[in-house]
Amino acid sequence: MSQSDDRIVRIDLDGASMGPGDVNADHERRVAIADLLEGNRFRPDGEVDGPYALRLAIEHDRLVFDVRLEDDTPVHGFMFALGPLRRIVKDYFLICESYYEAVRDAPLERIEAIDMARRGVHNEGSTLLRERLVGKIDVDFDTARRLFTLICALHRRAAS
């Protein structure tokens, strides 16, 4: 197995977890998926070599990682309580709202300050996600950032 097989080649967000979203969130989701597929490191613990397909969902207030091989052979499923991520996701949503409002008419300095705060909260969520995945799935920081964006998209839609 080569290191290049330690990657996601397909990602699906559960349609049942998805509802109508706003334009900005939908754009962020599409960009996160494209960036994730372009470059990621993703390796479930165990003996099964990739590349992998990943389905993300929210079921019964839990985050579901359904990991499969590229041919849809099941590898492993993981469920995580949303509680530890909930505060960070909520903070991220609030900062994103402020950012989108500021982009319309705020001075550049204010937009930059809000964007720095937004990236900081996003990094915090990504770090927490990596910590939650330890012993289950090995991901690099950029992959965790993109997955956090997708988890936020699911969380936003599950809450609406």
Curated annotation (Swiss-Prot):
Lineage, uppermost ranks: Bacteria, Pseudomonadati, Pseudomonadota, Alphaproteobacteria, Maricaulales
Origin: domain of life: Bacteria
Any Pfam family hit: UPF0262
Family that this chain belongs to: Belongs to the UPF0262 family.
Protein name as it appears in the record: UPF0262 protein Mmar10_1128
Source organism (scientific name): Maricaulis maris (strain MCS10)
